[in-house]
Amino acid sequence: MIKVSVVGAKGRMGSHVVEAVNKAEDTQLALALDADDDLTQVTTDNTDVVVEFTVPSVSLNNVLTLIGQGVDVVVGTTGWTDEKLTQVKSAIANGPKPETQKVFIAPNFAISAVLADYFATKAARYFESAEVIELHHPTKVDAPSGTAIHTAHGIAEARKAAGLAPVPDATETDGGSRGQVVDGIHVHAVRLRGLNAHEEVLFGNAGEQLTIRADSFDRTSFMPGVLLAVRKLAGDAPAGLTIGLDHFLDL
């Protein structure tokens, strides 16, 4: 059995993770911790893998503390910048087990979203234009989503590798309606009551358009991906920092 601790256990995502861990046949809940709990309770004696699902303002400190405890970490919290990732890599290198420490960060755990992102990177080289639209519930604290940023980076890298020119755009005045530009790709965020987590990637050429869309209607859609990451970290996942569930899928 894989002993799993959950940080953020009372949150919207964390509570679903606790339920999923309890239901799975090969995992057991070790500790369920929340905002006021001491993370140094999590040790290699009681935990094989810890799942961290909190908010961007505290996630980095949580992950650094857990690395210091020597436990492997699955991170579902979004809002990761290059600067934060550099701190994680440094913590691993200077932690108690630099050669074997595993940290996994997922922009999205939904299989549909991971596949949509993968398909988008494959399609990007064939289209002159590309834009990303992400749509979420109004209680989400970051915008654009980590998934959308990850998708935009992937599209930009694929376009660069193919030698494509910048996306055409004759806009001269923009009060913000064109969205955030991520590596030359416009990313738009919608926050609307009734939504959960959705993403559309639009590709265009003269006379044609390709739309790739992923919809997660309920948070249970993320649980297979979370459990996959837990099993991989408890098994044959490489040491160090890994970003993206696509690394654990046969794509």
UniProtKB/Swiss-Prot annotation:
Compartments in which it is found: Cytoplasm
EC number: 1.17.1.8
GO MF annotations in UniProt: 4-hydroxy-tetrahydrodipicolinate reductase; NAD binding; NADP binding; oxidoreductase activity, acting on CH or CH2 groups, NAD or NADP as acceptor
Pfam families the UniProt entry points to: DapB_C, DapB_N
Residues noted as binding (S)-2,3,4,5-tetrahydrodipicolinate in the record, renumbered to the chain: H137, G146, T147
Domain of life: Bacteria
Pathway info: Amino-acid biosynthesis; L-lysine biosynthesis via DAP pathway; (S)-tetrahydrodipicolinate from L-aspartate: step 4/4
Family matches, as SUPFAM superfamilies: Glyceraldehyde-3-phosphate dehydrogenase-like, C-terminal domain, NAD(P)-binding Rossmann-fold domains
PROSITE patterns cross-referenced by the UniProt entry: DAPB
UniProt keyword list: Amino-acid biosynthesis, Cytoplasm, Diaminopimelate biosynthesis, Lysine biosynthesis, NAD, NADP, Oxidoreductase
Binding-site list for NAD(+): G8, A9, K10, G11, R12, M13, G76, T77, T78, A106, P107, N108, F109
Protein family according to the UniProt entry: Belongs to the DapB family.
Name of the protein described by the UniProt record: 4-hydroxy-tetrahydrodipicolinate reductase
Lineage: Bacteria, Bacillati, Actinomycetota, Actinomycetes, Bifidobacteriales
